[in-house]
Amino acid sequence: MALDFLILYEHTVREYESDLLLKLELERRGYTAEIRQLLDPKHLRLFGKDKPEVLVASCMYDNEAINSHVYNNIGRCNKIVNLHWEQMLSDTQEEGDWFNMNGNAKRCVQTCWGKRTAARLQAHGMDAKNTPVTGAVMMDFLRPEFDGYFKDKETLCREFGLDPAKQLHLYISSFGYASMNDDEVAELSKMAGTDFTGFAKTNREIGRAHV
């Protein structure tokens, strides 16, 4: 029996809990769903008897992304949904080609956290039917049902020896750029059409300070 949904994730911290919520909701509605890491060993069953009807991807910017997410994992698929995790962008990134989808990625469903993102993608040639405004899945963790799921401020301060009476400023980053050399940052900047030099420098400085 074919699988209804295959959900692929890249970064565990960024995506996995939200993917679990999505999987459970799909199963509650009677669908079959499976979660796999993008680079997991490939399974022939996903190209054949368990080939999913819908592939849910973590990113889908261009034909190369379609190749790595879709063809390499399940072969041809006509129903592709991108959870589109990278939506908090700078003005420069919003204006560039990379984050506005290219090639056949424009034919995939690109979920949007808000109307502004949907309007931007439509202005760059995407159909309205492929840019649904869904909100961000991870925001569901703020619902009352998840009270107590995360540690509160007092608990975290106690664990790390901080004063809970003080205001805390959190710098949230994967620090993915901290380990990249200048040539790698330059190549990424060229590919994305925006300059990541300053951001990479900040990542390195903060990363070294907390090692």
Task: Give the residues covered by each predicted segment.
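Active-site and donor-binding regions of nucleotide-sugar-utilizing enzymes
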Residues: 3-150, 171-178
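Conserved catalytic-core segment of nucleotide-activated headgroup transferases in glycan assembly
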Residues: 145-210
